[in-house]
């Protein structure tokens, strides 16, 4: 297992590569559900269900994803606030298909587990690079990096988990492999009390 915290745009983007693979029974639950085609022409098929991980046959997968996410919150973000799982869904890209650029509304963090992936990076995009914020200068870039680029491509393979802020615009680049690219996505929101009564900023989210 290897992990990497990617500070693109000073954001806590996390990638963990593992050898965690699904059993045939678990994978059949993922791929045999009902799917709908996205409105874009890129052919991305998304599960109709937004509670895929509620299936009892996927308890092992759910435990794995939540363990990685909770470790991310505790050991990388280093905050004590509580998050809860709001949605879980699957998406499939066949050869030549991609996942259109989008964000996840009503979400603090999003997580993608790659059930099967041999091709197609996850791309995260910002309106401008970090050093363009404020003045939006057109710099003469010698070599792109996390400071002077408005996009970052994260290479993915089967078993990889990527966590990022849900408001970040992102897309999956085309799958050039003969085998379908299969992902399971999850979203998270906060619960609990934040702020302080005396500071007049206390709020409770249930």
Where are these regions (language model features)?
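Residues in well-ordered beta-strands of folded domains
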Residues: 17, 89-91, 112, 123-125, ...
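Short conserved micro-motifs at the rims of enzyme active sites and ligand-binding pockets
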Residues: 27, 175, 195-198
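Non-heme Fe(II)/2-oxoglutarate
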Residues: 1-81, 89, 98, 202-206
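A short alpha/beta connector and helix-capping loop motif
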Residues: 178-188
């Amino acid at each position: 297992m290897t992990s990497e915290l990617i500070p693109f745009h000073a954001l806590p983007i996390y990638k963990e590569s593992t050898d965690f693979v699904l059993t045939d029974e678990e994978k059949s639950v993922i791929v045999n559900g009902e799917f709908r085609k996205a409105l874009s022409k890129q052919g991305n098929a998304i599960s109709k269900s937004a509670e895929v991980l509620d299936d009892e046959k996927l308890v092992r997968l759910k435990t794995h994803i939540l363990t990685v996410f909770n470790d991310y919150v505790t050991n990388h973000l280093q905050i004590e606030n509580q998050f809860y799982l709001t949605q879980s869904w699957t998406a499939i890209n066949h050869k030549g298909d991609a996942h259109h650029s989008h964000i996840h509304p009503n979400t603090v963090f999003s997580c993608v587990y790659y059930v099967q992936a041999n091709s197609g990076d996850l791309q995260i995009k910002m309106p401008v690079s970090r050093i363009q914020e404020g003045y939006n200068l057109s710099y003469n870039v010698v070599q792109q990096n996390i400071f002077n680029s408005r996009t970052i491509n994260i290479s993915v393979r089967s078993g990889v988990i990527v966590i990022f802020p849900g408001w970040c615009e992102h897309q999956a680049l085309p799958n050039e492999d003969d085998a379908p690219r299969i992902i399971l996505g999850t979203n998270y929101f906060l619960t609990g009390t934040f702020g302080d009564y005396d500071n007049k900023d206390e709020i409770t989210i249930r």
